Amino acid sequence: MIDSTAVAAGHAKQPFYKHLYFQVLVAIIAGIALGHFYPTFGEQLKPLGDGFIRLVKMIIAPVIFLTVATGIAGMNDMKKVGRVAGKAMIYFLVFSTLALIVGLIVANTVQPGAGMNIDPATLDAKAVATYADKAHEQTITGFLMNIIPTTIVGAFASGDILQVLFFSVLFGIALGIVGEKGKPVTDFMHAMMYPIFKLVAILMKAAPIGAFGAMAFTIGKYGISSVTNLAMLIGTFYITSALFVFVVLGAVCRYNGFSIVALIRYIKEELLLVLGTSSSEAALPGLMSKMEKAGCKRSVVGLVIPTGYSFNLDGTNIYMTLAALFIAQATGIHLSFGEQILLLLVAMLSSKGAAGITGAGFITLAATLSVVPSVPVAGMALILGIDRFMSECRALTNFVGNAVATIVVARWEGELDQEQLARVLSGKEEFTSIADVDALPASVQPAE
């Protein structure tokens, strides 16, 4: 084991410009400036962002497999697996529904689309046809069946998080059941965690480059001026998401003995990475490592975080109901209380059916509107141009929601070291980055 005091002391001497969060922040600002002043060149930098995200996705499957399988194999009671999963799903259902309700309430109160008086017949339905077609392809049954991989290799080859998680849980249970006979396999997997997380640390060094390219492309392609036309909707969504994080999730954090502000400060590097790349998957390995370092047992971290990436989408849920009512208001369509409840129920189901798909937020909205006849699907053309600017906020809110969920479920299950959590969140035991190799062994230390 590494002396955490010595590690923290080493961090204190590190210049601020060597911290990953500072490098990513500078890269984001530079990307915005380049995209604004040289938009054509900025658009050409898209491969930098895409390449970095692909690099991270490359190692997500082994990180999940090793974390989940070793965590479950180390459980003395296999019933804990079902109990942790059950508590996590209850938490996800409650807060996903709450996020949808918050979106409805804010949309009815602020009415960001009121007064636009847009004729639905003048909207270009072709612009959103691709999203609508993808939405129709998704069903709850199809989604559930897709969790089961056709082959083990196929799950890892496709990088499907839920398929990898499904196999990892079953494999971990099998390892736990065979006991001592499976110990060589468990020891090998523990040993494999060191080079895998070392690889994660190496890849994270490229995070500023990825964030720079992704932000330069976004601003270069869509332009800052495109935001001003629908600033009311964007502002309403950002403020609502911030209130949800600091008020709703903040209250949950206080009830469970920690501060939402301290938690956000602890995961600031991952949040900046999500902001820069618009992909919460890019920060998944870092979040898993930090949650374990914060005192959550590996078995809980391995189950809650990957599952939450598909089922605990607070930001996406706020966006769905808020955007749906915005379209209705902008096109002069009045939705009754009953129609809004229908919208809420459909959104609850469709958000699960479209989980894990690229552009899931927009596709889920298309799926919801296609079932609710009162609101025209073509109305999505109104927000197509600014959706990219709202995707960052969706991803950030989803990310914070999953961090909170992990700690809360770990505490419910009695699998949280609260003293360790307090030390880490107070800064007494610093863990600055997944890219900080010195800190990694403590978070992947084999179970005694």
Curated annotation (Swiss-Prot):
Pfam families, sorted:
SDF
Q: Which GO terms describe its cellular component?
A: plasma membrane
One GO MF annotation is: succinate transmembrane transporter activity
One of the GO BP terms on file: L-aspartate transmembrane transport
Where found in the cell?
Answer: Cell inner membrane
Lineage: superkingdom: Bacteria
* Assigned protein family: Belongs to the dicarboxylate/amino acid:cation symporter (DAACS) (TC 2.A.23) family.
HAMAP family the record matches? C4_dicarb_transport
What name does the UniProt record give this protein? Answer: C4-dicarboxylate transport protein
Q: Which species is listed as the source? A: Agrobacterium fabrum (strain C58 / ATCC 33970) (Agrobacterium tumefaciens (strain C58))
Encoding gene (name): dctA
